Design a protein with these regions (language model features):
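Short Gly/Thr/Asp-enriched flexible loops that form oxyanion-binding sites at enzyme active sites
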Residues: 71-81
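Short acidic active-site motifs
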Residues: 45-49
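Short catalytic helix/loop segments, enriched in acidic residues and glycine
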Residues: 13-29
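Short, glycine-/small-residue-rich phosphate/pyrophosphate-handling segment
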Residues: 36-37, 86, 95-131
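Short glycine-rich anion-binding loops that position phosphate/pyrophosphate groups of nucleotides
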Residues: 2-5, 65-68, 91-93
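Short beta->alpha junction loops
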Residues: 34-44
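Short acidic/histidine-rich motifs immediately flanking catalytic phosphotransfer sites
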Residues: 53-60
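N-terminal beta1-alpha1 ligand-phosphate binding loop
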Residues: 1-18
Length: 131
């Protein structure tokens, strides 16, 4: 999702000091499954990627960042695909500004993990593996 490419420059108390690229490399080493990562700041590119993999991947773990609260287009895309989606957020969106407390995407996701830092991704993978 948007701004993950600059994660280590955000509020350190919420987002930590590790870049997402570094975290992703460590995450891949922990599991004997294929884990692909795609990041874009452009809504249309995110939709294109979801459409590309949404009928062939086993799962999508999606952090749509700010688009979570604004993108009807991403919500519509999630409704169309057959792949189950787990929505994750590093911060607790429900403890943030009012505009950030509503997800347009959640109703199209099998579950949501919020506010547990980068560990949210690991928890999503653990759920997928437990199956």
């Amino acid at each position: 999702g948007p701004n993950l490419n600059l994660l280590e420059h955000r509020n350190k108390d919420v987002y930590g000091i590790v870049s997402f690229d570094d975290y992703y490399l460590k995450l891949k080493q922990q599991y004997a499954i294929q884990i692909d990562y795609y990041q874009s700041n452009i809504e249309g590119e995110l939709i294109d990627k979801i459409q590309e993999v949404g009928f062939t991947y086993d799962y999508i773990i999606l952090n749509a960042g700010g688009y979570t609260h604004t993108s009807i287009a991403i919500a519509d895309c999630l409704e169309l695909i057959s792949c189950p989606v787990i929505e994750v957020h590093i911060s607790n969106i429900y403890s943030r500004e009012t505009v950030r407390q509503k997800s347009l995407l959640s109703k199209h996701c099998m579950g949501c993990i919020v506010g547990l830092g980068l560990n949210s991704y690991k928890l999503a993978i653990d759920h997928i593996i437990s199956g």
